[in-house]
Amino acid sequence: MLNAFVFLNCDIGTEPAILNEITDISGVSEAVQLSGVYDIVAKVSEQSREDIAKSVRKIRTIANIKSSLTMIVSEEEQQQHSAKQIEERVVQ
């Protein structure tokens, strides 16, 4: 499973409606509203980079999104994190 974080800038006041739309997109595992440089961040979890790209394209078609920045978590980091989670479960 690959993960990416999509940071969004939205038109003022449209954040709640955009959050509702984003959470309906398959592949979006969570999304929250932020204060600061970005208005919303969504976590996308998919099996491949191509599937992540499809989900990001769907997000970017939502009305009132002004810009987006997508950061894909490195595969090495995800593998290390997954191995650590498994190890923690075994120890417990």
Question: What is each stretch, according to the model?
Answer:
Residues M1-Q92:
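A compositional/biophysical signature of low hydrophobicity enriched in polar/charged and small residues
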